[in-house]
Each structure stands twice: as C-alpha cells, then as structure tokens.
A protein has these predicted regions:
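Short Lys/Arg-enriched alpha/beta "domain-start" segment
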Residues: 1-24
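Short N-terminal "domain-start" leader segments
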Residues: 27, 80-121, 163
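A cross-family detector of function-defining hotspots
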Residues: 32-38
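Long, continuous compositionally biased terminal/linker segments
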Residues: 38-81
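Short aromatic-glycine-(Arg/Gly/Cys) micro-motifs in beta-strand/loop hairpins
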Residues: 48, 112-137, 172, 178
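A short, exposed loop/beta-hairpin motif centered on an aromatic-Gly-Thr core
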Residues: 59, 131-145, 159-161
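Short, structured interface segments
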Residues: 71-82, 143-159
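Charged/polar low-complexity intrinsically disordered segments, enriched in acidic residues
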Residues: 160-198
C-alpha cells in the first residue's frame, strides 16, 4: 500500500500537535521525519513511515524509557486514526459542514473525526431515524480512546458494566492479592493460579 507524501505530512503534523499537548518538543528534520525531545534533549525520532526510532544512549534512564514508550503509544494511536481519516467517507448530514469523516458506524451511532489546527477532534452522535441528521453529540475533543469507548457503549457493542474504572481495577487487584496471600478462603491450586493471573 502506497501512502502519498501529503498523507505522510498530515500524519507527522498531527503527531507533532499531539506530542506537544503531552509535553514533548518535536521538530522536523532535514529528512522529513520528526525529532522528539524531552527537556530539550533528543529522545527519539518518528519517520514518515510511522513507528519510532531511538538510540539506546538517549533512553538510558527509567524516566526516559517511560517517555519513549509514551511517545510510541501516542504515535500508534495517531497512525491508527490518521489512516482512518485519510480513507473514511465524509459524514453527509443536513446542516453539518463536510469536514467530518465517518470513522465507525454501527446500529444508530456514528463516530466521526474532524481535522483542526488543534489536532483531530472526535465526536459520537446518534443518527436520526432517516439518517439525514445526527443528534445527542458526545464531544471528546482530541481524546480518541474515550471517543472509541463511548462509541462502543452507545452502539451496543459492549455494555458499560463490562468496563472498570482505574479505581475499581485497583480494588479488584487488591482483593485478588488478599485472597491468595491471606487465609481468607480455601482455594484450590487451580483457583489460586487463575487469581494470580489477574
């Protein structure tokens, strides 16, 4: 699959915007890729083809390794939605500008993205009965992960009750750890193995 120079440029521009929002400095190199800096010190590079490149000397501390991993996570998410934005159809509804693209559509819910100078903005809407309009928008600005989760719940792909908050996950972990480390329950070896895998 060939990606045009314009698509690569839009991808790198979006990555630069998102990285800046997350506290990283990024600038273009003479080769057209992005150079990412942390505290004004080179951290890694982002080639036009996606992914990241780095020198081991630039990620020599746990903090810099974590920062490199965060950049990689950001770049993967940006690549995912920019690939979709480049190929997605325009959302055609009455009274809405043509800059929104349909990223996902299931049941009566649509997930759309709209490019802006602040990065791609995401929204989920309910379709009207005749699919000529949308309503009840949930706006996520640049938060792609939350927009995807909202779409999955609103469209019925998953039930909200199947998701846990970070606080709930902490308590589940604590209870599992207490169950196997304490003498609260008589557990079989198989039950203990399953709980430890959590």
């Amino acid at each position: 699959m060939n990606i045009s120079a314009e698509e690569k440029n839009r991808y790198l521009r979006e990555a630069e915007v998102v990285l800046a929002r997350e506290g990283f400095q990024a600038d273009r190199t003479h080769a057209g890729s992005l150079r990412v800096l942390l505290d004004d010190v080179p951290l890694c590079g982002i080639p036009e083809s996606g992914g990241i490149t780095y020198r081991m000397a630039d990620v020599s501390t746990p903090e810099r390794i974590a920062a490199k991993d965060k950049v990689y996570s950001i770049v993967r998410a940006v690549a995912e939605y920019m690939y979709q934005m480049e190929r997605a159809p325009i959302l055609k509804v009455d009274g809405l500008e043509d800059s929104y693209k349909v990223l996902a559509d299931f049941n009566v819910v649509v997930l759309a993205g709209c490019p802006s100078k602040y990065g791609v903005q995401f929204v989920t809407w309910d379709w009207d009965f005749d699919r000529r309009g949308v309503s009840h928008g949930h706006y996520f600005m640049e938060n792609y992960d939350e927009a995807k989760q909202d779409f999955a719940i609103r469209s019925g792909l998953i039930h909200k009750e199947q998701l846990f908050s970070p606080e709930q996950m902490t308590e589940i972990y604590r209870c599992c750890a207490d169950s196997v480390d304490g003498d609260f329950f008589d557990l079989t070896a198989e039950q203990e193995k399953v709980i430890r895998s959590v």
